[in-house]
Design a protein with these regions (language model features):
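Helix-to-loop junction immediately C-terminal to a conserved catalytic motif
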Residues: 54
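Conserved ABC transporter NBD signature motif
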Residues: 62-71
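Conserved ABC ATPase "signature" region
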Residues: 70, 117-136
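ABC ATPase NBD coupling module
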Residues: 71-87, 117, 233-237
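Conserved ABC ATPase signature
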Residues: 140-144, 148
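A short, proline-enriched helix->beta-strand linker immediately N-terminal to the Walker B motif
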Residues: 159-163
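Catalytic Walker B motif of ABC-type/P-loop ATPase nucleotide-binding domains
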Residues: 165-168
């Protein structure tokens, strides 16, 4: 029986690009209101999982469910309805350089609501304030720091009050202080919005700070080889690959706060 607390369920998923299989036999579920980490070394397919969760890529086999709805097999209209309740932060932040921050955040509201221009501006200002960017409405992305760009991207991701947030390497390229502030913000959004948050990352500090549950992907075997609370995996996993990844900072590998 499916876990009634599950918000997102991945069942028997195989991901491939043409004949090249990236990952096979993925099974995991994300409970409502938790921060779920998709982790593993670079190149193991973490971002590919995220792309399949929102339909940018289609799985070779298997299914993705949002609640009781099979997203993988849903018709286009049903998919669109699901995705309107999902906010996404891409690794680059994906802000439009020709738009102000308020215009960037307001874009989904223009596309999917009947709000007036003034109402959209008010909502955009509120979302920017939620991520610590009050007063930056009329700045352009090039005029703010990388950490502020990530926060602006988060503001846009929550513009439609999503039930779920999917974040692709949110701390990539940030200095340790900015990364820590972003982690704090992610937890604040989880608590204030009650959102389910899936984070693709290999940043150890973030993994241990924000992760309620996780899955560990292994590029060599092309599947998930561990799952559970990151702190519990650190304490109890006997798999050498998992332990090497989770202790690499302590062993002198500069992996605690890496770029990319």
């Amino acid at each position: 029986m499916a876990d009634p607390r599950a918000h997102i369920v991945v069942h028997a998923l195989t991901l491939a690009y043409g004949d090249r299989v990236v990952l096979t036999d993925l099974d995991f579920s994300v409970k409502r209101g938790q921060v779920f980490i998709v982790m593993g070394p670079s190149g193991c397919g973490k971002s590919t999982v995220l792309r399949n969760l929102i339909g940018l890529d289609e799985p070779a086999k298997g299914d993705v469910f949002y609640g009781d709805v099979n997203f993988t097999r849903a018709a286009a209209g049903e998919r669109e309805a699901i995705l309107r309740r999902v906010g996404v932060l891409y690794q680059s932040g994906a802000l439009w350089s020709s738009m102000t921050l308020a215009e960037n955040v307001g874009f989904p509201l223009e596309e999917y609501t009947d709000l007036t221009r003034d109402e959209i501006r008010d909502v955009a200002s509120l979302k920017l304030a939620l991520v610590g960017l009050e007063g930056f409405e009329d700045y352009y992305p090039a005029e703010i720091s990388g950490g502020m760009q990530k926060r602006a991207g988060l503001a846009r991701a929550i513009a439609l009050d999503p039930e779920a947030l999917l974040l692709d390497e949110p701390s990539a390229g940030l200095d340790p202080v900015s990364s820590r502030l972003l982690d704090d913000l992610i937890l604040q959004l989880r608590d204030s919005l009650g959102a389910t948050i899936v984070v693709v990352t290999h940043e150890l500090a973030s993994i241990f700070t924000i992760g309620d549950d996780s899955i560990f992907l292994d590029g060599e075997t092309r599947t998930a080889i561990a799952g559970g609370s990151p702190k519990e995996l650190l304490a109890h996993s006997t798999d050498a690959r998992v332990r090497r990844f989770l202790t690499r900072g302590a062993e002198g590998d500069p992996g605690g706060r890496a770029d990319g």
